[in-house]
Amino acid sequence: MQAGKYLPRHAAKLAETVAYLQALEAPGKRQLVVWPVHCVLGTWGHNIHQGLGEAIARWEMHTGLTCNKVLKGQNPMTEQYSAFRAEVPRVDDARTALNQDLLVQLAAGADRLLVAGEASSHCVAASVEDMLGALPNQRLKRTVLLTDCMSPVTGFEGLAEALVLQSLAHGLGAMAIGELPV
């Protein structure tokens, strides 16, 4: 973009876009990936998979509790892989800041925290990285990655493998859903 090969759709956003890309690609951050349009509110890609949705509904009926569904990626001016924060939080949008309320709920929550979702190489990995930095060790040791309930973006399998190794090193479990004790 700095060389002028690519430009934002709105020329007035050039300086903001360049600053954003520099912050996004700062050491330890991610490189910009231009994704196809996906997970748009109101489309199947944004919805909970039907089988999982039915299982959640049964659990809610059985327990009388409500599953907390968290929206992310609501600001089109920043990437938000993690369920907890945007890659580059915006000062003009609190929804992009670290979701402390969600972290507090998870820290004090159920006996076991199960992690699943798409994609293990990006969104799940970013969410777990945020959990590793924010949740107490006793909570992390009661957290399990459901390895057959997630998959990587093609070409990024190494990031998904790194997620599992990093999680195990921090005391999280990793197993297939059929291996879960009842």
Residue positions per predicted region:
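Active-site-adjacent betaalpha module
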Residues: 1-182
